[in-house]
UniProtKB/Swiss-Prot annotation:
Pfam families per UniProt: EAF
Described function: Promotes transcriptional elongation by Su(Tpl)/ELL. Essential for development.
A cellular component term, taken from the record's GO annotations: super elongation complex
Stretches the record annotates as Disordered: 119-539
Residue ranges, compositional bias (Acidic residues): 420-435
Name of this chain's protein: Ell-associated factor Eaf
Alphabetic keyword roster: Activator, Developmental protein, Nucleus, Phosphoprotein, Transcription, Transcription regulation
Family: Belongs to the EAF family.
Species for this entry: Drosophila willistoni
Annotated gene: Eaf
Low complexity bias spans: 267-278, 309-337, 345-375, 461-493, 520-533
Amino acid sequence: MMMTKQKNTLADRLNIGGEVRELRLGATFNPKNSSTAFHTIKYDFKPASVDPNRMAAVDVGSNNQVTVTVPNLENSGVPHTVYKGNQRKYAKECLMIYDKETGAITLEKLNHNIQVKKTRSEMTHHKPSFLPATNINHNNIPMSTNGSGPGPGPGPGSGPSPPLSGSASGSGQKLENSTMRISSKTKVSTGSRRNNIIDFKPRNSPMQQSSPSRPVASHRSPQSAPAWNANNAQQTLPSIPMIMDDDDFGLGAALHNGTGGGQANISGSSTGSSTGQPDYGGGGSSSSSTMHRQRQVPQHGQHGKRQQMHQNHQQHPSPPMHQQQQQQQQQQHYGRGINNGGGSNNYAQQQQPQQHHQQQEQQRPSSSSTYSHHSNNMPMDLDFPRENDLTSQTMAQAGAAIEEQIGGVLSASSSSSESDSSDSDSGSESDDSTDDESRPMQQQQLPNLGLGSISPSYNNHQQLQQQPPQQQQQQQQQQQYNHHMQQQHQPQQQHHHHHQQQQQQQQQSDMYTSNRGFPNDLLQNDLQLSSNSSDDDDD
C-alpha cells in the first residue's frame, strides 16, 4: 500500500502519466567530471523568518565541518540563521531530476550527506562591538566563578568566518550573563545568612540561647535567681517582729491574768474589758489565742496585709452616726443579757465578800492589761484628745450625779431591805438555774462585737478607768450590805418582784454610766420607781 501510494503521489506530482519515458544519466556518472556535484542538507529546524528568495552560503571546513548561513527576512530583526554540522559521503545514493519544460528525466549521483543544527547566534550584525567583550568575559570568568572552568569555546573551523564570529560573540554574552547571575546570587545568599545571624538573633530567635556570641545571658540567669530569693527574704523579714510582738504581748497578758479567769482577753475583744463582766472562759481564751497564733505563723504575708487593712480602717474612723448605732446595739445586747439572765447578777451578789474582793483585785490588773493592749494596738484613739477631754468632763458630771442617786437609793432601800432580803434567798435556787443559761448567752454576745466597735468600746473602757474610786467603794459596800442582810432574814414572796426591779434598775444605771452616761429623764424615772418601791414596802 505504501509503494502504490508513493507511486500515485509521484505520478500526480510530476504529471508524467502512464507513458514510458527515457531515463538519462547525468555528468556525475562520468569519471572525468570534476565540476558537478550533488549534496543533501538536512535541517533540524527551519524557522519561518528564512527568506526563500535569497541564496544561502555553505562553508565546508576541516574535519568535514560545515557551516550553513541562511538569510532571513528584513522585518524579522535577525539577519541570518546559522546552522552547523558535519558531512559524510554517500555510497550508492542517487538523485532524479525532472525537467518540466522538456519532460526529460535525469539521474544524478549524490556525493555528501550533510546534517546541520541551528545555533543561537542571531546577534551577528554587532560583531565588532562584541569581540572585545568576549575577550574580557573570558578573562573574568575564573575570577568570578570560584574555581569553575571556562565555558566551552567555539568549535574549530576553517578560518574566521562571520557566522563563526557571531556565534562566538553570542556564547560570550551568555557566559557573561550566567557568571553575573551566579556571583550576584552568591553575594545575596551570604549577605542574607549574615543578616540572619546578626540581626535576627536578638529578636527572640531560637539561636539566642545556644549561640556562643551571647554568653552574657547564660551567665546572668544564675545571678538573677539569688537576687530574687534575697528580695523575697527581705520581704518576709518585716512580718517576723510583728509575730514576736504578738507572742510577747500574749505572755504578758497571761501573766497579768493569773490562773483565775480574769477580764483581759488576748484575742482583742474590747467589749469584755469595757463592760466589767468576768470572763468565765479565761483558760479557753488563752488556749484559743495560742492556737490562733500557731495558725498565723505560716501566713506571714497575710497577717501583715490584715494588720495594714486594720490600721487603714482605724485611720478612717466611722462617722458619729455609725458610732451612735453601734452604741445602741451594745445597749440592746446588754439589755437582753440583763433581762434574760438576770440571775447571773444575783448569783454574783450572793457570793461571799471574799470572792468579790478577789474578783475586784483581778479586774484591776486585767483592766490595766487591756488598756495597755488597746494602747499598743490602737494608736489611732490617742490622736483625739478633744474627745477624751469631753468624755472625762461628762464622766465627772455623771459620777457626781450617780453618787447622789446611790445615796438616796441606799437610804430608801435600807428600810425595805429587811423585809425584802428574804425574797432573794427564796429565788436563789431559780437564779442558780438561770445562771447556767446566762453564761453561754454572755459568751455568745461578747464575740458579736467585732473590730467595728473598737473605738467606742475603748472610750467606754477609758471612762470606766476614769470613774472615781469612791463610787466603786460605795458599790462594794452596797453589795456586801445586801448580801449580809439576805443571810439574816426569812423569805417573803410578796415583795420579791419589786426587789428584782430595783436591782435591774441599778444594773442598768451602771451599764449606762459605762456607755457615756444616760439622759436626765431616765434618772428621774429610776428615782420615781425607787420611791414607789419604798412606799410599797412601808405599806
